[in-house]
Amino acid sequence: MLRLELHRENLMRRTIVGFAILIIICAGVRSVRAGDKIDVPKVITKSDVEKIVGAPVKDPKGRNKNGTDGYYESEWSYRSIEGNAGIYFDVLYAGQGAPAHLTRTMFSMLPADKSKSTPVDGLGDKAIFCPNETGMAMLHVLKGDILITIGFHGQAPKTVLDSEKSLATKILASL
């Protein structure tokens, strides 16, 4: 009888300890996933942009936003102090509450102004370069459920693709 009670106590203790460990692991995974979201200015610095633009730029303006529909977006821009050069970034994560294949559907509808696009190899799952979309040279990269958009204004579209690819590579490496 005593042996049965000790066995029950041990079983109960092991169950509680196992459950506590499971909760700790789940909480850790959740915090890693929540902390994994990109903050563009921490990855692409003002100094990085100044090297590409070739001139001093203003501090970044933008936001990081958790959407109510299960998405996260880091949307930032850097503008030159003089002239009209600037670089725009938008990194969109489709969250668990987002419609299935949201970012893939969005990517398939690009470029937004229906101008000509060129596929770009070696970036994410798919990438396209849109040299004249909305007055900017835009690079769109799809990686899983993440859509990255980089827009460059103020220089000839032919000259910015390599810079945009370099910036996209840096963002992809931080995901």
Indicate residue ranges for each PLM-predicted region.
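A short, solvent-exposed beta-edge/loop patch
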Residues: 34-36, 41, 46, 50, ...
